[in-house]
A protein has these predicted regions:
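Core SAM-dependent methyltransferase catalytic element
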Residues: 221-243
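Phosphate-coordination loops involved in phosphoryl transfer and adenosine-cofactor binding
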Residues: 91
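A short acidic, Gly/Pro-enriched loop at the edge of an enzyme's catalytic core
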Residues: 141-156
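Conserved class I S-adenosyl-L-methionine
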Residues: 185-214
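Class I SAM-dependent methyltransferase SAM/SAH-binding core
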Residues: 95-145
C-alpha cells in the first residue's frame, strides 16, 4: 500500500543521507524516463527513445514510460549483464537483491519473482507504481536482515546493487542463508571508488571471501562495458556466478 504524504514525510526524516540521495536519484530518473518516452531525450543510457508503436500506451504517462523503459532497457540489461536467457529460471523462486523501483527480474519468464529493496515503499510514493507488476512479491527490507526463512530461494540475483549495502559481509551471509543448497547465485558487480550511494569498494578477494560458502561461485566475465555504462580502468564490471 502506498504511503500517505504524512507517512512519507515521517519516514523520510528517518532515512540516512545515503538513502535520501538514492531517492533523489530515482525521482530524477523518473523524469528522464518520461522525457525519453516522449522523444525529448533521443537516447538514455545507450537506449534509443521508442517509436510510437513501441510505446506501452497505458493512460498514465509516467507509468507508460516506466513500462516501456522496463521492456526496452531494464529487462534486456538484466539478460545481458547476467549472460542469461529469459527462460533460465522457469518454475523457480527467484530473489532480486537491491531491485530498485523497477522489478527487472520479470525478464525471467515463468519465475516466481521476489524484489527486495529497503526503499520499496518510498519508491511508490515518488511515482513508481507496483500495479503493473501484480505477480511480483515486493519486499521492503535491508539485505543485511532478510525476512525469509533459510533455504527459501532456488535463485538469488543482484545487478549493480550489491555495492549499495551498508554491510557487505552480513549481506553475503544472508544471501547464503536464504539460498537453497545447490541453488543458483549470480551477481553483476561494479568495482569502483566509493560514492555517496555506493559506499563499498569491492574486489575479487573481498567478494570471494564473503561468499566462500557458496560452492563454485567465481568471476566468469569482466568488462569495462555494461549494458548501461562504460567505465575506465581500474573500474570494471564483473559477473560472478556458481553455474
Amino acid at each position: 500500500m502506498m504511503q500517505s504524504e504524512s507517512e512519507f514525510r515521517k519516514g523520510y526524516n528517518k532515512l540516512t543521507e545515503k538513502q535520501r540521495a538514492e531517492l533523489r536519484f530515482w525521482a530524477e530518473e523518473l523524469s528522464h524516463y518520461v522525457e525519453w518516452y516522449q522523444g525529448r531525450r533521443r537516447t538514455l543510457y545507450k537506449t534509443p527513445c521508442p517509436e510510437e508503436n513501441g510505446q506501452n500506451g497505458v493512460p498514465q504517462l509516467h507509468v507508460s514510460a516506466i513500462l516501456t523503459w522496463a521492456k526496452l532497457h531494464q529487462c534486456p540489461k538484466y539478460l545481458h549483464d547476467l549472460q542469461l536467457t529469459k527462460d533460465a529460471f522457469r518454475g523457480l523462486k527467484v530473489l532480486d537483491v537491491g531491485s530498485g523501483p523497477i522489478p527487472s527480474a520479470t525478464c525471467f519468464e515463468g519465475a516466481d519473482i521476489y524484489a527486495l529493496d529497503p526503499l520499496a515503499e518510498f519508491y511508490e510514493s515518488i511515482g513508481y507504481s507496483r500495479t503493473p507488476f501484480p505477480d511480483v512479491h515486493f519486499c521492503e527490507a535491508k539485505a543485511e536482515k532478510m525476512p525469509f526463512s533459510s533455504h527459501f530461494f532456488d535463485v538469488v540475483l543482484s545487478v549493480n546493487a550489491i555495492d549499495h549495502v551498508d554491510d557487505f559481509e552480513q549481506t553475503a551471509a544472508e544471501i547464503s542463508r536464504v539460498l537453497k543448497p545447490g541453488g543458483k547465485l549470480a551477481m553483476h558487480v561494479h568495482y569502483h571508488p566509493a560514492t555517496e550511494c555506493e559506499p563499498l569498494e569491492l574486489n575479487d578477494s573481498r567478494v570471494r571471501t564473503a561468499f566462500s560458502s557458496v560452492k563454485g561461485f567465481a568471476p566468469c566475465r569482466r568488462s569495462q562495458c555494461s549494458f548501461t555504462n562504460d567505465v575506465l580502468p581500474p573500474e570494471e564490471f564483473v559477473l560472478w556466478r556458481n553455474f
